[in-house]
């Protein structure tokens, strides 16, 4: 099992990071909370989780061990796969997710793409006890730090990032269109668009 990878960020295309580890490039899918901390050429440590299926092997990477633990905990919930777990961690900070579960806030959870009312209720029931020990987390304000994207189009980058979370193209376009006039950087557009969709 690959527990973590230490290397240099070679390329970024939300939500995937290409990490150069001693000349070998690893494609790693990350939540936006991790992705938005990375810059091309940066040396980083990503805490990883490997998912093996019949047709593919996929690495998921996280900026810290706690986020990886939360991801693995989410995967234990019936009906939650890696894509949904990644979407949850991209939309909600660890702190907000724990708070949401502790306070039975179904309305916040159903705003995550792919999470319906039944899934949200199942998450509440199955995670309540497990999350009691996870009171500390990343603050929601710091969930999407600054990033420098390679693309010349911040709007296109933001739309692609939102679609990677599971939002429909039209939903992503509308959310980005509503906030793009106020921002010039992709990360700022993503952050504002996510906030607008969580209202």
From Swiss-Prot:
GO annotations of cellular component type: cytoplasm; Holliday junction helicase complex; Holliday junction resolvase complex
Q: Which keywords appear in this protein's UniProt record, sorted alphabetically?
A: Cytoplasm, DNA damage, DNA recombination, DNA repair, DNA-binding
Q: Specify whether Transferase is a keyword of the entry.
A: no
Q: Name the SUPFAM superfamilies on file.
A: DNA helicase RuvA subunit, C-terminal domain (SSF46929), Nucleic acid-binding proteins (SSF50249), RuvA domain 2-like (SSF47781)
Location relative to the cell: Cytoplasm
One annotated GO molecular function: four-way junction helicase activity
How does this protein assemble?
Homotetramer. Forms an RuvA(8)-RuvB(12)-Holliday junction (HJ) complex. HJ DNA is sandwiched between 2 RuvA tetramers; dsDNA enters through RuvA and exits via RuvB. An RuvB hexamer assembles on each DNA strand where it exits the tetramer. Each RuvB hexamer is contacted by two RuvA subunits (via domain III) on 2 adjacent RuvB subunits; this complex drives branch migration. In the full resolvosome a probable DNA-RuvA(4)-RuvB(12)-RuvC(2) complex forms which resolves the HJ.
Q: List the NCBIfam families.
A: ruvA (TIGR00084)
Q: What is known of its domains?
A: Has three domains with a flexible linker between the domains II and III and assumes an 'L' shape. Domain III is highly mobile and contacts RuvB.
**What is the protein name for this chain?**
Holliday junction branch migration complex subunit RuvA
Species in which this protein is naturally found = Acinetobacter baumannii (strain ATCC 17978 / DSM 105126 / CIP 53.77 / LMG 1025 / NCDC KC755 / 5377)
- Gene that codes for this? ruvA
């Amino acid at each position: 099992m690959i527990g973590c990878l230490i290397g240099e960020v070679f390329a970024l295309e939300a939500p995937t990071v290409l990490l150069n580890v001693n000349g070998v490039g690893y494609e790693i899918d990350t939540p936006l909370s991790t992705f938005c901390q990375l810059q091309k050429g940066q040396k980083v440590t990503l805490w990883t989780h490997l998912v093996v299926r019949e047709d593919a092997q996929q690495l998921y990477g996280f900026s810290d061990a706690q986020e990886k633990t939360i991801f693995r905990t989410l995967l234990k919930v019936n009906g939650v796969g890696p894509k949904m777990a990644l979407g949850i961690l991209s939309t909600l900070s660890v702190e907000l997710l724990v708070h949401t579960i502790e306070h039975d806030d179904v309305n916040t959870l159903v705003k995550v793409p792919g999470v319906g009312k039944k899934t949200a209720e199942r998450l509440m029931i199955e995670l309540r006890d497990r999350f009691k020990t996870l009171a500390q987390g990343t603050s929601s304000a710091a969930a999407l730090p600054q990033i420098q994207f390679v693309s010349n189009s911040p709007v296109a980058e933001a739309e692609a990032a939102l679609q990677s979370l599971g939002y429909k193209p039209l939903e992503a376009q509308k959310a980005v269109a509503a906030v793009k006039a106020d921002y010039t950087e992709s990360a700022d557009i993503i952050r504002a668009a996510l906030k607008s969709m969580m209202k």
